């Protein structure tokens, strides 16, 4: 496990080199999955830490949820400000230092903008609100790389707005239900391509550059990774599939620290992060 399935394995040195390759503009990576329980927030945090560790860019993880999102349990939170606080102060955000007042930051340099834990109607993130946040955080190179953790409970206009903003998507899949949910996610993109012909190339591009992460959240799995990877590549048309082995340090929704993971998991997360950057370089 912990490998690039069906493809030539690259040494860590080459993966790191690929991960560091330049990007021409600010980019958005959306972690999306139709179902819950696939370790999406965990992988969002882990990939973000890998990217922040190896790149000099400003990297931020955003909790895109209608209520309490998962990233605030996976990354350190030192700031009471939330995405709604940022929205209320958009007029004052002109540069990175302004945005930084609303984020938390871990030792890798990865920043976090949380969704907060309020379920009040006026605290619910809307599609329009999300679009304004992305617009402000990508303006003037405020942040170079934005990782958006799309909560499984996000549907409708907000989810479509997240997909619209994405340059690349990462789709975690754990077990049979996760694989089915990943296929549903891809089918949603095809539906949007048919519904909005003027945006069809964008939605089809998200499929062709997508990275699927077969996430092993238990010590044993009944899935055959190579068979699943072949299905995603040949029938669905994604660009890459990476297997992430089970790691006890990443279970139970605990805080993520990539320095604590085992070697196989560390290599898999490095692989996953490198594949994300490779997909970004093809899409922008």
Question: What do these predicted regions represent?
Answer:
Residues 1-31:
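Extreme N-terminal, non-catalytic leader segments
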């Amino acid at each position: 496990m912990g490998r690039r399935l069906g493809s030539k394995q690259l040494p860590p040195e080459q993966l790191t080199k690929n991960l560091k390759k330049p990007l021409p503009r600010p980019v958005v990576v959306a972690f999306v999955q139709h179902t819950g329980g696939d370790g999406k927030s965990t992988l969002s945090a882990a990939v973000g830490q890998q990217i922040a560790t190896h790149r000099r860019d400003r990297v931020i993880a955003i909790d895109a949820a209608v209520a309490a999102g998962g990233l605030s349990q996976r990354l350190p939170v030192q700031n009471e400000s939330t995405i709604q606080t940022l929205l209320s102060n958009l007029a004052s955000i002109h540069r990175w230092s302004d945005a930084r007042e609303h984020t938390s930051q871990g030792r890798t340099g990865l920043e976090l903008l949380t969704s907060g834990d309020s379920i009040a109607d006026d605290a619910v993130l809307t599609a329009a609100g999300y679009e304004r946040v992305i617009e402000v955080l990508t303006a003037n190179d405020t942040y170079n790389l934005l990782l958006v953790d799309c909560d499984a409970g996000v549907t409708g206009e907000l989810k479509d707005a997240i997909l619209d903003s994405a340059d690349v998507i990462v789709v975690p899949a754990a077990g049979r239900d996760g694989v089915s949910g990943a296929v549903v996610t891809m089918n949603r993109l095809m539906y949007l391509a048919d519904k909005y012909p003027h945006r069809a190339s964008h939605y089809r591009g998200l499929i062709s550059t997508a990275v699927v992460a077969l996430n092993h959240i238990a010590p044993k799995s009944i899935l055959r990774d190579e068979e699943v990877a072949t299905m995603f590549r040949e029938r669905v048309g994604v660009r890459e599939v990476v297997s992430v082995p089970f790691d006890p340090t990443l279970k139970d929704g605990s805080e993520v620290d990539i320095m604590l993971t085992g070697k196989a998991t560390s290599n898999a997360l490095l692989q996953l992060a490198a594949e994300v950057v490779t997909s970004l370089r093809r899409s922008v």
